[in-house]
Amino acid sequence: MSAKAQHYDVIRKPIITEKSTMASENGAVVFEVSIDSNKPQIKEAVESLFGVKVKAVNTTITKGKVKRFRGQLGKRKDVKKAYVTLEEGNTIDVSTGL
């Protein structure tokens, strides 16, 4: 598997919410990442895919809720988010598509 394909396995999709839009005003971009990826992998993937310099990476894991479907209990998957802060002068425009 090539290095670029591995980077696409780390970064799943951008997250566009009100909170992520407010974070983008401070130079941060929010991505959904694979649950087993770590901060150095996320930093390397963002720098190689988008050609920017990363200042910091903060991650959070949101536990999946227990939901009921047709009387059966099920669980939504856990989601890991990465708040990637970029160096001054670097931007990623996720609203236009990747």
From Swiss-Prot:
Q: Which InterPro entries match?
A: Nucleotide-bd_a/b_plait_sf (IPR012677), Ribosomal_uL23-like (IPR013025), Ribosomal_uL23/eL15/eS24_sf (IPR012678)
Q: What Gene Ontology terms for biological process does this UniProt record contain?
A: translation
For this chain, one GO molecular function annotation is: structural constituent of ribosome
Tagged with keyword Ribonucleoprotein: yes
Record bears the keyword Ribosomal protein: yes
Q: Name one GO cellular component term.
A: ribonucleoprotein complex
Annotated keywords: Ribonucleoprotein, Ribosomal protein, RNA-binding, rRNA-binding
Subunit-structure text: Part of the 50S ribosomal subunit. Contacts protein L29, and trigger factor when it is bound to the ribosome.
Q: Which HAMAP family match?
A: Ribosomal_uL23_B
Report the sequence similarity comment from the record.
Answer: Belongs to the universal ribosomal protein uL23 family.
The task this protein performs is described as: One of the early assembly proteins it binds 23S rRNA. One of the proteins that surrounds the polypeptide exit tunnel on the outside of the ribosome. Forms the main docking site for trigger factor binding to the ribosome.
What name goes with this protein? Large ribosomal subunit protein uL23
